[in-house]
């Protein structure tokens, strides 16, 4: 026999009441444990906020002051001084060591990686660039592309091609993405992977038609297709 609406309502209300009773009973039986858990959460959150405000924030401010000279040397292509300092001001390596938890310390890894690449120390460059955590999509794309450049110099073309494609896809834009795809296509041709090369070139043509790389992309597509 079907239950009446009142019976259904009473059953639902009774179930809810029982659930609330069980919850209240659980809280009452575990009051000490729950209090400890809540206090632990408060302590953890408070410690984290205090760490950020009282420790990291002043360190960040100091790091920003310290990195200025190294950035100036970097802009002048004085990469050794940028990396190691000049005796009066810190270089990127010292800033990484002294201020690693900060955003500036992270940025110093990017600068260090590019500096080592320019000095021909490709393994060191890759190490620093891989440890760099990009916050800006454009800088991230350039960093991954720089890793690929180093792999090319080391003769590791498979890794280079993968990194160029990764760089092109990371924060896709009309400037760096077609550059990275063009480099990827060239490396794929070096590897004899002409299908992948055509795919990279076709992507430039389809997705970045107004880029500088797209102006003469047809001849690269034709060349790769002829080698298939």
Short names for language-model regions:
Residues 2-40:
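N-terminal positive-inside, membrane-proximal cytosolic segments immediately preceding the first
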């Amino acid at each position: 026999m079907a239950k009446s609406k009142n019976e259904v309502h009473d059953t639902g209300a009774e179930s809810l009441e029982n659930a609330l009773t069980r919850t209240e009973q659980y809280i009452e039986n575990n009051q000490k444990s729950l209090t400890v858990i809540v206090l632990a959460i408060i302590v953890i959150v408070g410690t984290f906020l205090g760490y950020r405000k009282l420790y990291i924030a002043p360190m960040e401010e100091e790091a920003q002051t310290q990195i200025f000279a190294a950035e100036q040397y970097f802009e002048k292509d004085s990469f050794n001084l940028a990396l190691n300092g000049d005796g009066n001001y810190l270089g990127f390596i010292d800033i990484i060591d002294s201020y690693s938890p900060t955003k500036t310390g992270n940025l110093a890894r990017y600068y260090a990686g590019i500096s080592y690449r320019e000095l021909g120390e490709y393994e060191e460059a890759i190490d620093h660039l891989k440890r760099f955590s990009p916050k800006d999509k454009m800088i991230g794309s350039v960093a991954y592309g720089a890793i690929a450049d180093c792999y090319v110099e080391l003769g590791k073309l498979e890794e280079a091609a993968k990194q160029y494609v990764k760089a092109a896809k990371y924060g896709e834009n009309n400037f760096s993405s077609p550059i990275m795809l063009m480099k990827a296509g060239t490396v794929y041709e070096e590897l004899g992977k002409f299908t992948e090369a055509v795919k990279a070139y076709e992507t430039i043509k389809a997705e970045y038609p107004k880029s500088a790389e797209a102006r003469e992309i047809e001849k690269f597509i034709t060349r790769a297709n002829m080698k298939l």
